[in-house]
Structures are given as structure tokens and as C-alpha cells.
Amino acid sequence: MYKYVIWDFDGTVFDTYPHSSKVFKEELEKYGIYEDFETVDSLSKVSFGHLCTYLLNKYPDFTREKYAAIGKINREDEPGKVFAFPGAKELCEDIVKAGGENWMYSHRGPTAKTLMKEAGMLDLFKDFVLDGDGFPWKPAPDAVLALLERNNADKKDAIMVGDREIDCGSGYNAGIDSCLFMATSYENTRSKYQATNFDELRKIIFGEVK
């Protein structure tokens, strides 16, 4: 069993992309930018930075400040509308019951804890690295290494779980195993494992898959 499970938030534990893509599409239209839902959704699933770069390159009048303003609107609209994936809470509970620990590593800020508390999941997580904690973004290994160090954890006992290659990249670069989970594509990944649902992920975490 992997004793330390490092989770990504968006698209991994919480089903946030449908809501955020809808909000971004609607708010972009207020700036005269018309992109279809599928484009916004697919770009954000690579990374929100990828979406921002796409918009900045395509629309000369679009700015990072406008992007940040839309992000703020999205976050403020999430409570009561964004929920954990079915099976996420149960798996996190079983990890704790088996003597393991859940950690969170997300580019999201304090709203991660707000939504986790709303879902009754906050107490299932022992440690967090969130936006604003001063670490370079994924796939840099710094945050993963810091989590391991401050919890006195052995690398062989830890796994990074995320829906994007940058999540797995941060684990790979830190020297730990990773699982690409519920991803839009499983090609060209550095992850040791791939899983399409929580039942498959459970088997990986609990050592039933080698």
C-alpha cells in the first residue's frame, strides 16, 4: 500500500471543470471573446495557465488581469455548485482507516479547503500545498519534496495522483510514483500507473496492482 497519497484537486478529487468552463465561456463573452465550451474545457484540462496563454496569444486586448478577474468570479460562484466526485470521499476515508495519509497539492488557493469542508472531507487530509504557499507550479518537484520532508516520508511510500500530465510530472520529477487519473489522454505520460475510475485507483493505492 502507498501510505502517502498526494492528490490534485480540480478534476481529480472535485469535479470542477464543467462549472469553471461554463463560467469562463460566459465571462469571456462579456469581453467580446467567443470560444466554444469544448475549447475552453479542453485547454483548462491541460492547465489553466495553458488556457490563459491561448487567450493572450489569440486576443491582443485580453490581459492577465482580465483572466484573474474571471477566475475570481468562478471561485466565488463555486460553493453549492461544485462537488467531489462520487467515490472520492470513501477512498480517502479508507486510506486513513488503513493507516495512510491524504495530502493535497493544488494550484488552487484557499477555496480548496472551503469546498473540502463543505463536502465533509477537510479532516481527511493531513497536509496541503496550495497557491500562495510560495512553491513553483507543477511539474516542478519542489512542493512534493517539501511535503515528503516535513512529514518524514519515504519516497517509495508516496504516490502523486492527478488528471493532468503536469500532476504526474511533479511526482516524477520528485522521484515518486504517480497515477494519471481520469485523464483526457493517457498518451506520452511519465506516470507509472493509469486509472479511469476510483475502483482502479483503489487497487493501485492498496497494492493490488504492481
Q: What residue spans do the PLM features occupy?
A:
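Asp-based, Mg2+/Mn2+-dependent phosphohydrolase catalytic module
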Residues: 1-3, 93-96, 100, 109-210
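Generic detector of contiguous secondary-structure segments
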Residues: 10, 107-110
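Conserved SAM-binding loop
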Residues: 13, 84, 104, 160-161, ...
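N-terminal helical cap/lid subdomain that shapes the substrate entry/recognition surface
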Residues: 2-90, 94-98
